[in-house]
């Protein structure tokens, strides 16, 4: 049996502040029209931290990890498939295109003491028929867990995008414990050509290497491209909406294993997009102190790009109120003591660096 916690419950389990309970994973997607250069898929997705990732089809190679002719060290997650996609040839749609492509991937592994845990998060482009056929294009946000275990019991897995709890039985273990935990959660699959469903998935904001961004040259175009990570390396990352930039498994007999190393892929877009700003909660409270004086406050919680960006709001009195962000997750809070009025509603504003700079928070 598996229990997946809601975003609010996840925040509570992780001990986050009340204003951090809403996860705004992805913010926007390319609305088209969609051409053959992206095989009929959306060209980009934008997350709530403001980063925009293109569908990663570049054959740029890692300058940090050498590849081989049979296994090039691509910066994008390109998956050769006999009879479908030959990565030695030009990527062309239709004709020579992978059955799966990605805007973003993040993978991590834990192998210790009989535990073999594989984790994957992805924003994926695929086809309904599992073959690259025009008119069958779909996208989805995926969370995948595969765990081999040695004993039954209750297991909690914490990852950058949530918390999963599994009650593993002897029947789940079988004879060898292989695949005792087996979870694939795909969110966002809609009608072919509708790529908006993935905005409601569990993936996002995009994880990124603390050592990035990386720049590599596209061998086909000669242009310099920027990537959020190198999928050929395992590195520390940032970007979790809960601040859980790690993979952890806890279980029976004091089991507690953890890694902070991920292999991440994603190509930063040159598309310029408006800065994301999502109002999570706005409240007004009024009371009086012992002397009878009125105490009042307007409180505003928003999701926006974290520092070095800035956020503020204009209160009902017309004054600018600077907001604060405590943990690099993009959850901002501000308070004003002005009395509310229907004639002047709160007006939040976000001021990021322009262009958005790289933050390792």
List PLM regions with ranges.
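Extracellular ectodomain segments of secreted/surface proteins
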Residues: 115-143, 262-301, 361
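Gram-negative bacterial Sec-dependent N-terminal signal peptides
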Residues: 1-23
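Short, aromatic- and glycine-rich surface loops/edge beta-strands on solvent-exposed regions
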Residues: 157, 195-257, 338-360
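Boundary/junction segments of secreted and surface-exposed precursor proteins
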Residues: 22-61, 65, 77, 275-288
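Short, surface-exposed binding/anchoring microloops in extracellular/periplasmic proteins
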Residues: 55, 67, 71-82, 87-93, ...
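Extended low-complexity, serine/threonine- and proline-enriched intrinsically disordered segments
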Residues: 59-63, 153-188, 293-325
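Non-catalytic macromolecular-recognition regions in eukaryotic signaling proteins
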Residues: 41-44, 52-62, 71-129, 292-295
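Aromatic sugar-binding surface patches on proteins
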Residues: 83-85, 137-141, 175-232, 319-340
């Amino acid at each position: 049996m598996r229990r997946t916690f809601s975003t609010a419950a996840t925040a509570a389990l992780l001990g986050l502040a009340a204003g951090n309970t809403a996860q705004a994973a992805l913010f926007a997607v390319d609305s088209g029209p969609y051409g053959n250069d992206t095989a009929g898929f959306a060209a980009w997705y934008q997350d709530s931290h403001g980063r925009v990732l293109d569908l990663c089809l570049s054959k740029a190679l890692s300058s940090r990890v050498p590849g081989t002719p049979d296994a090039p060290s691509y910066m994008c997650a390109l998956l050769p498939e006999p009879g479908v996609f030959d990565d030695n040839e030009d990527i062309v749609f239709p004709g020579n295109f992978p059955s799966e492509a990605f805007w973003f991937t993040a993978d991590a592994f834990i192998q210790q003491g009989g535990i073999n845990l594989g984790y994957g998060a992805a924003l994926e482009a695929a086809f309904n028929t599992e073959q690259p056929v025009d008119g069958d294009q779909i996208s989805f946000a995926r969370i995948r867990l595969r765990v081999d275990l040695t004993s039954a019991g209750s297991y909690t897995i914490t990852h950058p995008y949530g918390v999963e709890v599994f009650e593993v039985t002897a029947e789940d273990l079988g004879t060898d414990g292989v695949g005792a935990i087996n979870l694939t959660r795909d969110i966002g699959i809609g009608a072919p050509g509708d790529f908006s469903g993935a905005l409601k998935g569990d993936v996002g904001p995009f994880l990124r290497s603390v050592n990035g961004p990386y720049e590599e040259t596209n061998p086909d175009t000669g242009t310099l491209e920027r990537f959020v990570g190198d999928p050929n390396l395992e590195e520390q990352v940032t970007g979790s909406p809960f601040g859980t930039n790690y993979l952890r498994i806890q279980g029976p007999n004091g089991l507690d294993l953890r890694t902070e190393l991920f292999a991440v892929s994603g190509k930063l877009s040159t598309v310029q997009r408006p800065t994301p700003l999502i109002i999570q909660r706005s409240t007004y409270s009024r009371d009086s102190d012992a002397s009878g004086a009125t105490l009042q406050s307007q409180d505003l919680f928003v999701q926006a790009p974290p520092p070095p960006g800035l956020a503020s709001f204009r209160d009902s009195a017309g004054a600018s109120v600077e907001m604060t962000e405590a943990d690099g997750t993009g959850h901002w809070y501000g308070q004003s003591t002005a009395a509310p009025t229907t004639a002047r509603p709160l007006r939040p504003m976000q001021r990021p660096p322009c262009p958005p700079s790289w933050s390792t928070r």
